[in-house]
């Protein structure tokens, strides 16, 4: 049966939505299928909060999943809109919000369709572990750029397309240690920092920073690193602010 969002943006793969929807029941379990994501979340939040004053800020979380980062941002005082195309995950996020008392505006919506509504621009947009799961990641970056206010920042995390990433993020994580279900990632969809930088430039954004992010399964913790050969975070700013500070 066609989904309700088949009428709107086509920049998704149904197989990807189904894959992550299967994790719904354990999304908020720190020892469940999303265990690595729980470890990454404090690092992602710290990276964002050091670059944006979150209290009172309008923040968009693109591909929010079950709401781990969305709630963390809202706890810092941000007014968070969180979008995802998996209805099961949005339902799980809303239910957890009822339990935690944290208010987030969760929507089953594609970013292209949010853009068409011409909402008030955002101070910050987070797009975490999402670009490698869509057919046209450059289009997502472009839509994000159009939704940022002058001086707003876009935060992205993804996986580099390197041999090290294939061996650790695919072979190691999915087949050896089994931290993730088999088929979670496709190597061909990984994104090199230079590719991301080109998309950001084309969208009119200025790349401020690229930092490596490393997950240590034996300690179940994550940290920033100078190495960007596997996971990495990036921050880009709208051109008005970058020009004003030159």
Swiss-Prot record:
The UniProt annotation places S-adenosyl-L-methionine binding at 44, 63, 84, 128
Q: Do you know which PANTHER family this protein is assigned to?
A: METHYLTRANSFERASE, UBIQUINONE BIOSYNTHESIS O-METHYLTRANSFERASE, MITOCHONDRIAL
UniProt keywords (A-Z) are:
Methyltransferase, S-adenosyl-L-methionine, Transferase, Ubiquinone biosynthesis
Q: Which domain of life, per UniProt?
A: Bacteria
Q: What class of enzyme is it?
A: transferase
Q: Which Gene3D superfamilies match?
A: Vaccinia Virus protein VP39
The reactions it catalyses are: a 3-demethylubiquinol + S-adenosyl-L-methionine = a ubiquinol + S-adenosyl-L-homocysteine + H(+); a 3-(all-trans-polyprenyl)benzene-1,2-diol + S-adenosyl-L-methionine = a 2-methoxy-6-(all-trans-polyprenyl)phenol + S-adenosyl-L-homocysteine + H(+)
Query: What's the protein called, per UniProt?
Result: Ubiquinone biosynthesis O-methyltransferase
Q: One of this protein's Pfam families, by short name?
A: Methyltransf_23
Q: Tell me its EC number(s), please.
A: 2.1.1.222, 2.1.1.64
Species in which this protein is naturally found: Xylella fastidiosa (strain M12)
Mind listing the GO biological process terms from this record? methylation
In the UniProt record, does the keyword Methyltransferase occur? Answer: yes
Which molecular function term from Gene Ontology is one that the record holds? Answer: 2-polyprenyl-6-hydroxyphenol methylase activity
Copy the pathway line from the protein's UniProt record: Cofactor biosynthesis; ubiquinone biosynthesis
Summary of the function given for this chain in its UniProt record: O-methyltransferase that catalyzes the 2 O-methylation steps in the ubiquinone biosynthetic pathway.
Family the entry assigns = Belongs to the methyltransferase superfamily. UbiG/COQ3 family.
Cited InterPro entries: SAM-dependent_MTases_sf (IPR029063), UbiG_MeTrfase (IPR010233)
